[in-house]
Amino acid sequence: MNISRKWLREFVDITATDKEYDSVMTLAGQKVETTERMDAEIKNVVVGKVLSMKKHENSDHMWVCMVDCGSGEPVQIVTGAQNVHEGDLVPVAQHNSYLPGGIHITKGKLRGVESCGMLCSYKELGLTEHDCPEAYADGIWILNDEGCEVGEDVNVVIGNDDSIVEFEITNNRPDCYSLIGLARETAAAFNVPMKHHEPVVKGGAEGDLCELLDVDVQADDLCPRYTARMVRNVKIAPSPKWMRQRLRSAGIRPINNIVDITNYVMVEYGQPMHAFDYRYVKGGKIVVRRAGEDKTLTTLDGNVRTLQPDMLVIADETKPVGLAGVMGGENSEIVDDTVDVVFESANFLGSSIRKTALALGMRTDASAKFEKDIDPMLTVPAVNRACELVELLGAGEVMDGMIDVLNYVPQPVTVKLEPERINALLGTDISEADMIEYLRREEVPVVDGMIQVPSWRPDLRVMADIAEEVARYYGYNNIETTLMRGATTMGGYSDEQKLENAAGAAARALGYSEIITYSFVSPSSFDAIRLPADSPLRKTVKLVNPLGEDTSIMRTVILPSMLDILSRNYAFKNKGVKLYEIGKIYLPKDGEKLPDEPKRMIFGTYGEHENFFTLKGEIDAILDQLNVHPATYIADTKNPSYHPGRCADIVIDGKKMGVIGQIHPLVAETYGIGGEVYVAELDFTGLQAVLAPERVFHSLPKFPTVSRDLALVCEESMTVGMLEACIKKAGGKLLRSVQLFDIYRGPGIAPGKKSIAFSLELRADDRTLTDEDTTGVMNAVLEKLKNDLGVSLR
């Protein structure tokens, strides 16, 4: 945002130098990027008066002029301009002067006659025909009507005796994209009063506004407010010099008085405006609507714009006449013979304007301001200021009244002033009275301890925002450096984190490496693991903006993630791997926006020495390390992802806590893995509910252990787990461990049966076991096996 220091002085009186101003404003939070003098390029150019003219003796088109430059003796200057006469006031570039572009003017001779400078045109001073509409295009700029004096610096005449300050405005301060907003900031920073100006409109033009103009805001969700006034009997002409100079200082090209007024108000108030030629507004009706079926609009820059149905447009009864908040239409442009004008001062939804400007590739000054969601309360003072300027310039007759369509209810915003919390946050000791004073300087009143936030300050919503304002005017450089203070809390792990760390450590101790995979997977992963089409696990959380099809849903099973990594390792010729992961799955809940996010722990392995029982033993070891209740394994022949003869459910305390087995050969083939792949999945979240009481450590046994072996004959369908559970139940307190050491099928064993051998260890804590003790336990075990399972001793 660029502002003129001269223009700024209309609102706030400050005498600071440019350097002082930049420093104070930057320290107050409004960073100054650069400050440039407008007169930096023009040096030693003054107003001169042509005293006499005579023909050049060696040229038929040149004149030798004697010019009074206000420095005493007249100087001789040779010119070829034909529009200069004796008595004219003209710009004179004297000896050793500089013009825009680095042009250096010195004494010289033109066809043998000495010339001590140059008479200048407006173009040579860096101006355009819009800056000087009354000047000759190809002649010397005659200054007779400019109210200047001989010897006066030409920079003063053209308004270059000014500094342009460029501010870096953050998007949360839309009020500072205006001269008034920055004047308010300046007044607060320098602690001086701001000069407010309330527009005064005389009005009185003939006619009834409500009969001539109607406004229909159909897209009220995109247009919180629309204000319009009408001016009759307009006289299109160049703007006065002072207005042209101010617009030029803001980087805006003057066009004509009506258009210049809209731009002037935009700079001053930060409220974009537009002027329509009333005769081209068919039916005298302005409709604010979406483009709908309208396909194109030719904008003021002469380009045909292709409209999208949801773009906001300003239309009359039959056609669009402007792109709302971006640019007006060529079909309602202000031209030289315009008689009646409608001033639009509206507020549009920032996101809608940003979308339109981006789609059409036409970011204008207006759209840039609307994108920031400017204050809807600006529309009325802005349109009144425009009408006031019309009357000031004598550019037309303003009609009484206005049309103001308000589609929102202003909600007062208050924030409690909390001095103690603010001081604690800033590390200061500022009194409440000083805080109130800092806020008053910004025109933010405090009533009964409550801050009344003005409509133009959308950035003030919570205590931290208020603390920032206090710090700005107290001075960041005045805040002393202090050590951090406050209560500290010792860090620690939650029970879930402790269990996760322990599980990971146990897995790594067994040679497993941890992997971390994405929670986003492809829908095709369900087919890859042969998940049934009607499985509830196919109901997923879908991403709105996925990176691609392969990462378009949140996983409901963790198996595909493990198989992807195993497949990659197999493709890289890794002969054997052991991997584990603890990760979340995402299970949608009916009627809930967010899914359940239980954790799963999965183990995956392949290689020459890997098999079902090795993995089972490792799972038992990990569960034992975690102090989980003992697990039993129940055969599962229906899991489609696993081999039907080598899969079991992991059951703890009667609850299914996971699955273990060999991956189905078809699934392994889909993932490009040759050989046998073994996987175990655990409900890690559920494990927390089946933890055993804390371990009690006992002293080393004082009495010996007795070992006995049992070779049992059972049905082929009977599992080791069933036998082991029965033995433990019958063995009582004296039975310390049961270890499988052999499974035999062959001669001596009937068809359909198998021999399973266990090693049992017996021990008492208070005595040495006798043969009777040992025999009693073994007999009890054999009887239990025979009665419950029909198992006999081999």
Give residue ranges: language-model regions.
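Glycine/proline-enriched, intrinsically flexible loops and inter-domain linkers
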Residues: 4-5, 23, 57, 63, ...
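A carboxyl-terminal module marker
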Residues: 2, 19, 27, 441-444, ...
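Conserved mixed alpha/beta core segments that line enzyme active sites in large multi-domain catalysts
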Residues: 47-77, 150, 245, 256, ...
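Mobile "lid/hinge" segments at catalytic clefts and subdomain interfaces of large enzymes
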Residues: 114-131, 135-141, 155, 163, ...
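Phosphate-backbone binding interfaces of nucleic-acid-interacting proteins
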Residues: 1-207, 342, 361, 365, ...
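Extended, well-folded interaction surfaces typified by the phenylalanyl-tRNA synthetase beta subunit core
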Residues: 415-575, 708, 761-763, 773-794
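Beta-rich nucleic-acid/ligand-interaction surfaces
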Residues: 39-43, 201-205, 265, 488-489, ...
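Terminal amphipathic helices with adjacent charged low-complexity linkers/tails
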Residues: 190-217, 394-422, 429
